[in-house]
Amino acid sequence: YRLQSRNWRVSPLVDSPGLTLYVDGSCLGNQNVDASTPASWGLVVVIGDSGLGKGSGELTHEEAGPVVTSPGSPGHIGAEVGSNNTAELSGFAAALRWLLMEGGDGAAMIRADSTYAGNLASGVWKAKANRELVANVQALWDEVSALRPLSWSHVKAHRGHRWNERADHLAARHALGESPVPLTFWKPGQR
């Protein structure tokens, strides 16, 4: 954000993109993780989001899925263990695959509470761990960014940001093997 000196209002550096995709990961017992540690990701797609966290815009799609750690299994993209980090990266992969399937060419922004996943997915950082997973997510990033303007931004976790909290809810419920609370009955912060 930049501060406008004339009237002292905070405004975004760029116009809000038409599509904003919120991703989050969840892992049960994120210590001493291995291939059997339950971990999942959540994805929320919003049209017309202001980015302020109040829940503006229209929710057009949401989904959740597991971190797949078995090579050769459907959905495996290189994760070796279930962890918060592999779940966050898998969430980025889901968002990027969704953008490819959506097929548009308008600007898209992915918002996440993991700087680790965002900087690795976008190629800002070089992977020291999860190399195969990161390489596959970066390949998806490159494919999508060749078709449309693509960016990512950080959102603070567990601060009441409605769409980030919804992605967190989807990921946590999936990791627990539970169905998410329908949006009309769900409250931010509810896992």
Regions found by a protein language model. Name each.
Residues 87, 91:
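Loop-to-helix element that buttresses phosphate recognition and phosphoryl-transfer chemistry
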Residues 1-86, 97-98:
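RNase H-like nuclease fold core
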Residues 26-33, 38, 71-74, 78, ...:
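RNase H catalytic domain
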